[in-house]
């Protein structure tokens, strides 16, 4: 993974974990968990692409990888909508900046996953 993307993930996760969003802290924890899961999935796709000769192994290890890919895109779309919603309702500038950066990162990661998945097909 690009070092800038890694630091962006780490920075956003750290800042989101410090936010206090009142009764929606459970939702925020869910978002953080999904961000972490998305990062791991993106890393595994990149690793499979980098070892393209190992594609057969990747497909055997994860026989339903196309189905999983579809689920990840659904998660990304949900996270994008959730981040946009949070961005609209928050008045705290720290939270606004964090959510804007999270939105940008999600869009970048979605594009990277699309690129990797096309290379694997």
Swiss-Prot record:
GO terms for biological process: exit of virus from host cell nucleus through nuclear pore. A motif (Nuclear export signal) lies at residues 12-21, 85-94. Its main location: virion. The keyword Transport applies. The keyword Transport applies. It is found in: Virion; Host nucleus. It comes from the Viruses. Mediates the nuclear export of encapsidated genomic RNAs (ribonucleoproteins, RNPs). Acts as an adapter between viral RNPs complexes and the nuclear export machinery of the cell. Possesses no intrinsic RNA-binding activity, but includes a C-terminal M1-binding domain. This domain is believed to allow recognition of RNPs bound to the protein M1. Average number present in a viral particle is estimated to be 130-200 molecules. Interacts with protein M1. May interact with host nucleoporin RAB/HRB and exportin XPO1/CRM1. This is Nuclear export protein.
């Amino acid at each position: 993974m690009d070092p800038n993307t890694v630091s962006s993930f780490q920075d956003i996760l750290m800042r989101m974990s410090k936010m206090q969003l009142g009764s929606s802290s459970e939702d925020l924890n869910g978002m953080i968990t999904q961000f972490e899961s998305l990062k791991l999935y993106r890393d595994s796709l990149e690793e499979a692409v980098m070892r393209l000769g190992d594609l057969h192994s990747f497909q055997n290890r994860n026989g339903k990888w196309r189905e999983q890919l579809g689920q990840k895109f659904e998660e990304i779309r949900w996270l994008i909508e959730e981040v946009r919603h949070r961005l609209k309702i928050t008045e705290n500038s720290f939270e606004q900046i964090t959510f804007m950066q999270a939105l940008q990162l999600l869009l970048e990661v979605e594009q990277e996953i699309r690129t990797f998945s096309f290379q694997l097909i």
